[in-house]
Amino acid sequence: SIEIEIDGVTVTTEESRTLVDVAAEAGVYIPTL
């Protein structure tokens, strides 16, 4: 697993997950096309 920080929120997740999915789970919206 890896630890990333998004908007000041530290999230631990698996390496195979996408950043957009992890951000959404943490309550952070990242606009996509």
Swiss-Prot record:
It catalyses: H2 + NAD(+) = NADH + H(+). InterPro entries: 2Fe-2S_ferredoxin-like_sf (IPR036010). It is found in: Cytoplasm. It is an enzyme of class 1 (oxidoreductase). Its main location: cytoplasm. Belongs to the complex I 75 kDa subunit family. This is NAD-reducing hydrogenase HoxS subunit gamma. It comes from Rhodococcus opacus (Nocardia opaca).
